Structures are given as C-alpha cells and as structure tokens.
Amino acid sequence: MAQANSRSRNSATISYPEKRRARVNLGKREVEILKTPYLLETQIESYRKFLQKDIAAEKREDNGLHAAFKSVFPITSYSGYAVLEYVGYSLGGESTLFDVEECKLRGLTYAAPLKVNMRLVIYDKEAPAGKKAIKDIKEQEVYMGEIPLMTETGSLVINGTERVVVSQLHRSPGVFFEHDKGKTHSSGKLLYSARVIPYRGSWLDFEFDPKDCLFVRIDRRRKLPATVILRALGYDTEQILDMFYKTNHFHLNQETVTLDLIPQRLRGELAVVEIKDKKGKVIVEANRRISARHIRLIEKAEINKLELPDDYLYGKVIGKTIIDKETGEIIAHANEEITAELLKNLRATKTASLDTLYINEIECGPYVSDTLRLDTTTNQLEALVEIYRIMRPGEPPTKEAAESLFENLFFSPERYSLSAVGRMKFNRRVGRKELTGLDVLSKEDIVDVLRVLVDIRDGKGDVDDIDHLGNRRIRSVGEMAENQFRVGLVRVERAVKDRLSLADVENLMPQDLVNAKPVSAAIKEFFGSSQLSQFMDQNNPLSEITHKRRVSALGPGGLTRERAGFEVRDVHVTHYGRVCPIETPEGPNIGLINSLAVFARANEYGFLETPYRKVVDRVVTDETEYLSAIEEGDYYIAQANTNVDEKGRLVDDLISCRYKGEFTLTTPDKINYMDVSPRQIVSVAAALIPFLEHDDANRALMGSNMQRQAVPTIRPETPLVGTGMERTVAVDSGVTVIAKRSGVIDSVDASRIVVRVDRKETEDDDDIGVDIYNLTKFTRSNQNTCINQHPIVEVGDKVQKGDVLADGPSTDIGELALGQNLLVAFMPWNGYNFEDSILISERLVEEDRFTTIHIQEFTCVARDTKLGPEEITSDIPNVGESALAKLDESGIVHIGAEVNAGDILVGKVTPKGETQLTPEEKLLRAIFGEKASDVKDTSLRVTPGITGTVIDVRIFTREGVKKDERTLEIEKAELSKVEKDLNDELRVREDALFENLEKLLTGRVAAGGPNKLAKGTKITKSYLADLPRQKWFEIRLQDDAATKRLEASHEHFKELRETRDAKLKDSRQKLTQGGDLAPGVIKIVKVYLAVKRRIQPGDKMAGRHGNKGVISTIVPIEDMPYLEDGTPVDIVLNPLGVPSRMNIGQVLETHLGWAAKGLGKKIGEMIEKGADAKELRKSLKPIYDLSKTQRFDLEALEDPEIVMLAKNLRKGVPISSPVFDGATEEEIKQLLKMADLPTSGQAALYDGRTGKKFDRSVTVGYMYMLKLNHLVDDKMHARSTGSYSLVTQQPLGGKAQFGGQRFGEMEVWALEAYGAAYTLQEMLTVKSDDVAGRTRMYKNIVDGDHRMDAGMPESFNVLVKEIRSLAIDIGLEND
C-alpha cells in the first residue's frame, strides 16, 4: 500500500507539501512517540488475512478462506470409500479483467476468480477388512465463484458501487456469569446465572430459581434441573455430590454420635453442647453462636473429636450410599436426609460410621443437593431421553437418537465451536492456567462452570460486566466474509456427500462433484445485502475514513435497536483509548454505533487494544506497548499530560492516573504506564476539532458528525486553526495522489503526472522507472458530490516517496480542507440571526467561496420488448426541432450542452402495440408510408429542479449489436488517451536508455558503423547527434565488453517497444469488446450532469463545534458591518448561540484565527514591499519559534523555497492546536499582539448601512465554516399536476415521486373551523381524487368558465367496494 508506507520516512526530510505551507504547532508535549497509525489498517489488514492472496499455499496461516476450506474438507462419502480432499487455492490467475474504475463504470463487481485444487481419493471396496487400499487418485482445479477484492483504500466495489463492510462489536464467545439485578422475583432476590456462548453452536445456560435450585437451559428452551445434564455426562448421584461438597465424618455406636471435628466448619452454628478443653474449661457455652474467636480457641485447645446428641444429625444429608455389609442391601441412599428412623436402622445394622454433606449457610449452600431431589432421572439414559424430549418435542426418543443428539450439541466440532477466543476466555474465567484447548466443550468444562456459579452464589467471586471491552470483541470484514464462505461450503458439503455415494463415482472428476453456486451466492448475499455491508459515505475524505473505522453493535449476531438498553449505549471505562466517547450518531442508534479511537487496533483475538508508554522506576521510556482492556486493569496508568523533566522522570509527588477502571491519585513509583498522546481517547473526526477541550460533549458530538457532511467546495481552503491531524487524514483517505517512488516530475497536465523515478529506486540499472499517475477528473461520488484531482507539483520538482503530488476533493496542498475561513462577527443583526440563523455577505457568493459541484448520473436503457427492440435515435415522434437541438445524430446529448428540467438527454422510442387507427391516421399512412404511430416517445429527460452541464457520456452496447457513431467516437478518444500514456512511458525510458548509450559510446574506438564511420576512429558526441538514434545500434566497437553491452541495450530497446505494443493491443481489445449487459438489454447510455450550486438562503452551514444554522439572508457587501480599516465581515453569528450551548471552543478558534490571519497579512505586506528571502526568513523565524515542540526547521529550506512558503502564508499562517493539548489563553494573546491586533479579541464595528459605530466592541475573528450536504435545492419541491396513485387516484407524496402536499386531518379541521365550505370541497374533490371533476375543471378553465362542479371522490368508491367485500350491500340512492 502506498499510503501504508507513506509514514515510514525519516522525519529529517521535510515533505514537499510541508515546504509549501507548514503549520505552527502550539502543542506542549515533546515529539510524539508514536506516529498516528495508518488509519485504514483495520479493514485492509483484516481482508488481507482473509484472502492470503500472495502467500504460497503451503505457507498460509489457519485463517480466512484457508481455514474455511480446512474446517469443511475432507468430505467422506457415507460408505467411506470415496474422499474429496482440499489441497490449496489460488485467486485470479491473470490480473482481473477490469480495474476498479472500469468496474465502477460498467456496474461490475471488482473481484477475482477463486480456483481450488481438489483431490478425489477412491478406496478399493474389495480390499481385506481393516486394510484400506487406494484404488484411484484424481486431482483437479475447481472454479468456486468470484471473491470480491478490496481496493487500495479499503472499500469494495460491488455491482459498480463502492461499499464498506463495517466492523461489528459483538459479545465475545466464552462463559459469562451475571444476575438479574433482582428484577425476576418480587422479593428482589438476586438470581445468578451462567451462560456459555460459543462462536457457533447451541447456547448453554445455568440459572438459579428463587428457591435456590439450579436449572439448565439449552438454546433458551424449557428448563431442566441442572443435575440432568451432569447425569447425561455419565455422573451418578454420589459423584455429583462429591464434586460439589466436602463431607463430615461421624462415628456411630449404640448410644453416642462422635464427630471428627474440623473447627473451621463450626463457624456461625449454634453450639448444641458445651465445648470444653482438655482441662474441662468451657470454651463455648451451649446454645451460643460460634464465632471466629471461639474457633481460634478450639484450634488452640486441639479438640478434634466432639460427642453430640442424636438430634444434631437429624436433617443432615448423607453423602455416600450406606450398604449393609452382611446382606449387601442399601440402607441409605446418597443425598437422603437423616431421620430418627433411619438412625435407628443404621444402629440396628451396626453401621460404625457415616459421612454427611458439609452444608453451611455462610459458605456452602445446599443448592446441588436440593436440585438432585427435584431431578426425576436416575441414570444416564433417562437423562439423555429427558434432554431429547426438550430439544425435539413430539418425536419418539430412541437410545441411539438421544445419545447422538446430546453428543452433537456440545461435543462435535461440526456443530459446535468455541473458537480460540472462546477457549481463551473460558479457561481464564474458570481459573485455569493454560489458555488453549479443544474447540468443543468437555465434561470438566461443564462441571467447572457449575462450580464457579455455585461459588458466586456463595459469595466467592463476582459477576461479569457485559459492557466491558474485554467481553466484547471486534469482528471485521475478513472474519465475517469467512463465516459466510463457510456457510456456503457447508451447503456444498451435503450435495457432495450425496454425489460421492453414487455408484459411478469412479468415473467422476472433482469438478463434477462440486457445485460452486451456493458458495458464490453466500458471498454475493453477504457483500450485497448484509446489514453491515453499507453504501460508502463519500461526501468528503473524512466521511470515507470514518465510515471505514466505524464499529457497530447492530447487525447479524448483534443487538437490535429496540432491545438495546441504556447500559450498552453508555460510555464505559474501558472505552478509554479504544472507542471514541464523542463520535456516535444522535437518535435511535446513539451509543450502538461507535468510532475507533485514533490509536486503537484489534489484537489477534479481536479485542481492542491501545498503546501506552512504559514507565520504569519513575522514568518514562520511549517503548510503547499495546494493552487490551483485560490486561489494562492491573496497572497504574498516568495521563499523557503528566509533568516530566528533561530526562523523562515523573516530577510530581502525586499523579492522577487510572487503576482498575477508577481515576485515582498515586505516588510516581507505582506508575507502570503512561498514555501515548492526549488525543488517544478520541476518534479521527473529533481529533480534527481544535479546542475540543473547551466544548460541551453534546456539541462536540454534533461537531464531529457534521464535519462528515461537509460538501467539497470548488476552491478548498485549509483551516487556519487546525489540530495537526489534517495532513494525516488527507493522505490516508486515498483521495490525494501520492508518490509511489521518489523522482523528478517529467511532465504535468491537468489530468496526469509523469514522474521519472530516481535511479536508486529502480531494480534494474539500465531500466529507468516511469510512474504515470492518471488523475480522476470530475467523477461522481456515492453522494453525488464531485471527485476531482488537480496537481500541486511543477515540472522539474524533486519529490520523495510518499509526497502528495495532487490534491483531491476537500484537500489543499495535502491537508484536509472541508470548509472556508470566514471573517465572523458575533452580534445580532436585525433579527436575521434569530434562533441560530446565519447571515452571510454577498461576497461569499461572488467569490464562489461555497460553490459546490454536484454530479448527477442519468441512465437510459434500451431493451428488447415483446413488440420489438427499443431504439436510441434522434428521430422521435411529435417532438419539435428545438427539443432535439442538443442531441447528435445518434440521439445522445452533446458533451458541454447546458440542459434544464425536462430537456431530452437521450432520445429513445419504444414500439407500441397495434392500435385501432382513426381514418385520418389511415390516410396519412397511405400517403406518407408514415410509421410514426407505432412507436411512442420514451426518451430520458432531465428530472424537475435540475439544470446543469453535460460533462460525460458513457455507452455500453451488447455483444454483436452494431455500434453507433457516438460509441466509436468515445472509444477512439479513450484509446488515444491510453496510447499517449504508453508513448510517454516509452519516451522517458528510451531517453534514459540512449543517455546511458551516449555515455558508453562517447570516446570509444569504433570498428566501423553507419555514415562511413572508419575503423579506429573515436566516437564523438557530435557524430552521435547527427546520427538517428535507432542507427546507434549499428555502430561496431573494438572493445568486446562494450559491444556486449551495446547488444544488451539493443535487446532492451526492442523489448520496450514490444511491451508497449502488447499493452496497447490489450487495451484496444478491452475497450472495444461489448459489455455483458443484463438479459434483454441492448444498450445502456449513462449521461453525467454537473450541477453548480451556489450558496443561498435555506442552505445549512456549521462550524466545527456543533454550531449549526440555516442561512436566513444574503446581505450586500456595503450593508455588512465593517472593521475600522473598512474590511466588511463575511458572516454574522448570534452571540446567544454560545453560552447555553457551552461550546466555547468556537470563540477561542475565532481569536486564534484572527491572529493567524493578521500574521499572514503582515507577511503579505512585506512581500509587496519587495522583501528578499533573508528578510522573510528573519520575520518567519519568531512565528515558527512559537512551537514548543515539533518545531519546523526553516534552516532546511533554500531561499526560493522560503519565498514560496511566505507567498503561501499570505492568506494566513496555519496553526495547529492539538486536542487536549491546545493553545493557552496567554499564547493566543501573544499571537494577537504579534499580529498587531487587540489582545481582547474584540474590535469596534461600524454599521454598513448607516456608517455609525456600534455601541459595544464586538468579538471578531476567523472561524472555519462548512457547507453541509443539506441543500435547499434538494429539498424544495413544487407540483401543479403530476402522477396519481392507482387505487385511490390521489396524488402521490414526496419529492422523489413528484408528489403533492398532503392536506391532512388537522388541516381539514382548520377549514371546518373557519366554515370555508367551498375551499374544503375543492380540497377534498377536484384537487385530490375526483377523476371526473378534474377533467371537467380543466375543460371549464379552457372554456374561460371558472365554475367548479365536484363529483364523487374515488376514495369513496374504494370505501364502498371495501364494505361490499364484507358482504354488506351498500349503494347510493338516486334522488
């Protein structure tokens, strides 16, 4: 990736755009330890892992496509005699037929064919038992459909539109323990539950009921006692009790009961008897509660036997089954309560000892024992049958069916998988050391879950926090695509199994067994219509980047809006540095859709992690470490702005830090890590808001969301007050053109840049590299905004790898430029800025400051109809000459034509069925042989409300259909463009080749050659200059080594020409071949209109701080308030919009912007006075010295570069004030002072209409304003007559349908209240759905008679019909 590597340059060299215009950085922190990472990494990396495209088959890791194949293959037939194995796969042998741009134009998917190597092994059926003999092996490559490829900028082109697959934040697989917060039962008792969530397979839930019995649910079905599942696993009652309880051992004789005492277990009980030490001293009196102090005394006294009365045993539970040794009969079952009768029996059979369960209310409850009493099953088979009945109600259970069902639920890798993540989380939660293991559950797993759940109920351990980012993980494109692919493969598997079992499998090849349809269908469905595969937001570069970095909790396997509560949407402690707390949509999705923080990334398990600097013994090191939310909790982490001395030691005695999710103060020696950067916690969009720290969170949220809606203006202007992120965003978004290799600019024009690459960058010495960059010109984005690139370099400029060569939409010299810097005044102005309205100066319209270009695409399709083919032609019936004036002879509009609403863009006629002809028509036909009446006009016209210029026409013709003139013309133009590129490349390479040759030949001794070159003469430059260059190869030299080099050069020369010809042929074939259009389509014509939208009242504008408003009016320049020096302001905002909204950032931005502009003005004045480079350098130095850190090195620039820099600073010196580390009040005042402006930031203003001074001084300055994509032109709509709904005959609604305005229920009430009967009648009949009345009305008006006679509204007839359909006869009485 060009962009990915663009940062790896050492910072010593200053990039080309920075030399042209550098920012003064007002951040306080020393140089950033970690450069902002490549912003699209999540998407690109994830998809790269999925495809593993350029990795050899044997070296591929176990994820993505490879993993999906391995999990499904090998497929064995039911008999086991035939096996289909997977060997490896390859993606797209030759480079894909069309590149990204062509796919967009032709409406295709940018994809590569997937070919899979498969091996069919057939075993010999006649082989002796136990020995498998291979009879036959066949290997073949099988085509498995197309896999979409990702573009360089992390989007996918599906059916010609750019889409983005948004990452999903879902609950990680593993085991979770929670309680119901006391909501289930009226007593408010906490009911604990455990849930095992697999990556795929059945969910397993354990839960307590209000009586403290344990139950299990499988897949949220009816609950069963939890011990049923333990029995199904093969445990009996005794083993189950043994797993959950310790036992107390009692010795029985005929009179007494003696307990083997373990003192700890007495805690909290009532002493039944007095407990005395050896000397007879009483430690605990009878009927006293035994406390911890008593227990210490008992332990000290070393009492280990205790005689107890019989009734102490009553109610205790037997732990092990007691059998009569003589007869072998069972006297007492395990889990049976002891009664007086049972004790009598025991004594009668001379049982010497018994074990009871140690159950204690404080630390060991009777839950499992109680549950066993509820459990009606007694052995494994009964338990399995019980589970089968729940899972498959109504089916008769058999032993085999019950066993296989239970086996498949949790223990078969096909049906159940925890995945590596799930296993890691599971083992961690149940307290095991090793983090790997089987993907399926084991007996021990289920028992461990129950054990932890019982412990939590007993008060040991805590429940989990679902919203903790250690329990939620990111699923990116690659992983989701892999899952879909696997689903497709599983569908294929069933079919393959059936085919493998056929008798004639020996004659089949792998290709005959595998049907690729289900796989490609699954992939197509995912990329085309999944909830997370979204139409890319392409308003501006920022909205693209943000869309690709979005994280959604919605989507398949996620939450739904309706069910998501407040907790999920809230900002969680673990979001710090991982997910932005600010940027999220307003409305029903708030908090469910988030944005990744600037430095965040997903680790191998899919958990988000964020970088920290290591702190060792109070010293901050430059080493960074990424920590996930789980690991972070155990460390003390200091903030990024903690005070540090020169050596990196922490200075303060108490340091504010985070520990276990809480903010605390602690001593420096405890600190383990420190934040990398102050902007670590916010997302890209929020990091672009200067003085974010002074804005209220709600407004910052609006600010970051509105920046994404800014429309690219014609003349982008970078913000005077930025944050230093602007360059990063512009480069990473991929809208700019970036140098792939360093070199010198060979030629530049508006649509391409040719770079002669530096020698050191090319692999081959002879070969000189040429990079040709074709720029995108006036193309339509997904949001109909305009994508246009223009070069910023000049011929002869030296560029480094990674430098910006051309600006794209909304970028200015390689920096993001979403809006314009305007001179703003905060004051009321005649009520025109009431309620956030905005007042602007006519100057903004004149200077085209907010003029934007929108590109509309119109498509005309000619199809084959039943009555014959439609035809695209300029011969259209009943259309005047004037309407056809803008079309060419093929019936398609000229490029450059200006068209208005209703104009014809493409003339098209459709055959209509034979109709009964009137006598006149028959006559006409007889005379003229006129066929005008059997076609109707179905031309493509411009939709209402649009005027624009035609900028491009594209024509796609079906294979085998004759191409019209226009198509051939377009193809010719395209081909000449390609030819020009190839010729330029050839020219540059040949020049370099001959340059090398000249060095080789000059001064050598010749052995003969053209132009009568005598043997033994020395070759001179002048001789070579007179000789045509092709003839140089005919020179014969005496030096053998040199001759060899000459021959090699000749070969190379021929090779270059051949390569050019081959490429040209390839392009010609690609251009002239017909498109594979949809069935029944003959021709498609796409016309692109450019619409220029100037700013006007009703358009929505906003600043970067959530200060939005609608333009109320545009005031002439002479009426605007003006400053003392006569400068009129550009825009007037209402000061009341600031205090209640608490976005003070805009005021600070205004002050700093004014200072920046003032400094620029001073530099401009110096240039006008003719200052030289030395003076300019001297005056620029104090400005750039304001940077405490990351100081721009003026010394590195040469004099011409200094002059160029100064010229670019005339409009204002750009300043960066990073988020949470911005300029202070003192610095702003200092800058204002340097610019000779009042340090208060306020100035006296004069009224433009009267010339009088306003009473108070007004806050004036430069603010960066954006024009948002909510334009009044797109919203305003009017209709006189138009289309009607079929059934009700009422006008349609909405702008898209060219509908009318609804006159609703409440409006009817209003007219009724006025008693305006006639108006009301008109509204409800002729203006709505009285069909007959409408036509009569029209007739009357034509006749000059303005009366109205209303008829029957159609909706009344619909009502009558509906009542009749209920078998009620209803009709109107005729008077």
From Swiss-Prot:
UniProt keyword Nucleotidyltransferase, yes or no: yes
Domain of life: Bacteria
The enzyme's E.C. designation: 2.7.7.6
Single Gene Ontology MF annotation: DNA binding
CDD domains the UniProt entry points to: RNA_pol_B_RPB2
Single Gene Ontology BP annotation: DNA-templated transcription
Keywords attached to this entry: DNA-directed RNA polymerase, Nucleotidyltransferase, Transcription, Transferase
One Pfam family this sequence matches: RNA_pol_Rpb2_1
Catalytic activity: RNA(n) + a ribonucleoside 5'-triphosphate = RNA(n+1) + diphosphate
Alphabetical list of PROSITE patterns matching this protein: RNA_POL_BETA (PS01166)
Cellular component per GO, a single term: DNA-directed RNA polymerase complex
HAMAP family (UniProt xref): RNApol_bact_RpoB (MF_01321)
Assigned protein family: Belongs to the RNA polymerase beta chain family.
Function: DNA-dependent RNA polymerase catalyzes the transcription of DNA into RNA using the four ribonucleoside triphosphates as substrates.
NCBIfam families registered for this protein in UniProt: PRK00405.1, rpoB
Quaternary structure annotation from Swiss-Prot or TrEMBL: The RNAP catalytic core consists of 2 alpha, 1 beta, 1 beta' and 1 omega subunit. When a sigma factor is associated with the core the holoenzyme is formed, which can initiate transcription.
Protein name per the record: DNA-directed RNA polymerase subunit beta
